[in-house]
């Protein structure tokens, strides 16, 4: 009697399973948070308060940062994308903070006048919380 072979027994099924495992592994978690060379997380924390980021975002370690307009920034190091478009690397997150409208014109996040250096400091804080 011929029994049907399980889907994963075929070479194509095994390749598909391996690809799925690889893609799921890239979705988040695991590994250390990236570092931001030359940036200061304590300065970033102060800048988050100065620019009022907590009015729209929930941010760990920042007093009264319990906004609900924008996404929570808690556990930021686990993110893989910013605004669903940009890879969440320190460089791209800093670019987003400096000029979010450039990357997503319909975003409600305002351009606040944050300099590139300040953005790197903010990113350093977000990745360390």
List the predicted regions and their residue ranges.
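Bacterial N-terminal signal peptides that target proteins for export
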Residues: 2-16
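C-terminal motif of bacterial Sec signal peptides marking the signal peptidase cleavage site
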Residues: 23-26
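Detector for the c-type heme attachment site
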Residues: 28-30, 56-63, 78, 127
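Electrostatic cytochrome c docking/interface patches
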Residues: 28-49
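Extracytoplasmic electron-transfer domains, predominantly the class I c-type cytochrome c fold
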Residues: 46, 64-129
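Hydrophobic packing within well-folded, soluble alpha/beta domains
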Residues: 53-56, 122
